């Protein structure tokens, strides 16, 4: 009888140890405490939006669950063939939650401006999908830090460091530039299918 009572306790302890070994608590870039699988146990990642998808494609393309819209010909020309036909899960109010859940991502990543709305969106998305959602700072000036954070999260530190170093060098080069006011140009950066969204 004693052995019978000890066995479940030991089994429970083993389960707890195994669970701890397979997960970790991190602080994401919004300051949220999130329990996520260890890097080797993250098999696929849902991107909450296009910026997150691009980050994932650059850092860990094989873990990218899919895109957030149909890629156009220009985008396909610079994206490797094997990733062009990943499913389109939508974004924002148009996310196909059933399709995402069926695809069974390990975690989700949301890249954008860190504010109360983003934090709320991450929490809501986590409840809807039933997986941890990690917030990443999408500010351009935080690019290097974001790459390194993603690399550590996904176990792709070497690739992330290459991207982070490139970002830091680029910003350093820009800081050194001295362009006279009359030589500076104004640029329109458009988004959307017709480049008419800002």
Language model region names:
Residues 1-54, 158-189:
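Bacterial Sec-exported substrate-binding components of ABC uptake systems
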Residues 26-32, 103-108, 128-130, 148:
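Acidic/histidine-rich, surface-exposed loop or edge segments in extracytoplasmic proteins
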Residues 34-35, 85-94, 133-142, 149:
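A structural signal for short loop-to-beta-strand junctions that line the ligand-binding cleft
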Residues 42-43, 61-64, 104-106, 129-132, ...:
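Loop/turn elements at helix/coil->beta-strand transitions in domains of secreted/extracellular proteins
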Residues 47-103, 107-116:
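A short, structured surface patch at a secondary-structure boundary
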Residues 49, 60, 104, 112, ...:
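Sec/Tat-exported extracytoplasmic proteins
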Residues 67-68, 90-92, 109-113, 135-138, ...:
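Short beta-strand->loop
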Residues 117-157:
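Charged, glycine-enriched surface loops/patches
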């Amino acid at each position: 009888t004693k052995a019978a009572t000890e066995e479940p306790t030991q089994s429970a302890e083993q389960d707890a140890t195994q669970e701890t070994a397979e997960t970790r608590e991190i602080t994401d870039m919004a300051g949220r405490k999130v329990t996520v699988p260890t890097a080797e146990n993250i098999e696929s990642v849902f991107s909450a939006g296009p910026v997150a998808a691009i980050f994932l494609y650059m850092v860990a393309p094989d873990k990218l669950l899919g895109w957030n819209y149909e890629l156009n010909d220009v985008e396909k020309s610079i994206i490797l063939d094997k990733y062009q036909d990943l499913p389109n899960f939508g974004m924002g109010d148009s996310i196909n939650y059933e399709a995402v859940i069926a695809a069974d991502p390990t975690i989700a990543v949301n890249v954008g401006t860190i504010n109360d709305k983003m934090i709320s969106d991450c929490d809501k998305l986590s409840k809807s999908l039933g997986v941890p959602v990690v917030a990443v700072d999408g500010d351009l000036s935080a690019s290097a830090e974001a790459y390194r954070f993603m690399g550590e999260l996904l176990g792709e530190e070497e690739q992330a460091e290459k991207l982070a170093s490139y970002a830091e060098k680029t910003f350093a080069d820009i800081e050194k530039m001295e362009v006279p006011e009359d030589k500076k140009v104004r640029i329109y950066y458009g988004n959307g299918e017709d480049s008419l969204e800002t």
